Amino acid sequence: MRHGIVLFTCDRGITPARAAKAAEERGFDAFYVPEHTHVPVKREAAHPRTGTGTLPDDRYKRTLDPWVSLATAAAATSRIRLSTAVALPAESDPVTLAKTIATLDHLSGGRVTVGAGFGWNTDELADHGVPAGKRRTVLREYVEAMRALWTQDEAAYDGQFVKFGPCWAFPKPVQTHLPLIIGAGGGPQTFAWIARHADGWMTTPGEQDISGKAAALRQAWAAAGRHGIPDIRVLVAAKPSPGDLAAWAAAGATELLWGLPDAPAEAVEAYLDRLAGRIAIR
């Protein structure tokens, strides 16, 4: 299994560039950052971890832009993959976002993986004009439209939420296919969506025993006529035992995502030293 690092970016603590550089130097395979454009003060949507409107971490209100963060990380590194856990594409203009991601892939030498979510904070999405009951449809259209812009010399798209006429959009990504991983609670609807439109699944923190869900995803994958196997990335929520690591590997996990502490830069680097030693990647 590969090992990635997740930095909950905010306006304090270690910078994305320094964290990505430290992760790369210690042998980690990928660097992830999240996205929230803003958090409405009054919300109806419950947070998945608290079950209420209470946020479990004040960094939700202070999150840095993910693509700017990854651009600084790209400039400080040469090997580590650059990703999001997760981005919310529906909160951006799709043509502009396609340009941003293609540019990042171009300038980083083809190191981008898009981790995307449907969005639990429906109040946040509503401020961007996304109807709560149409989140999956909107994301599908964004993905289809951006892939057209990334792969076609003259791209056009005509959907319910995304429309643009024939246009030129360069640069194209270095990668002929930009990987798309969906971070969402595992279930039949999500797995069917992934099997049709994405390359893999990223678990939520509450999903640690994934054996049954991984099998269900592979069944949906085969039913959709997909070849190979889906990418499965586990967001590690606590300090796992060797048995947990073995169980994830047996279930088909391809990558484990380890969160960084909300701490000063030196403390984060010391944590990375300990983590790299514990999982024996150095």
Which stretches of residues belong to each language-model region?
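Active-site-adjacent structural elements that line small-molecule/cofactor binding pockets in enzymes
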Residues: 1-282
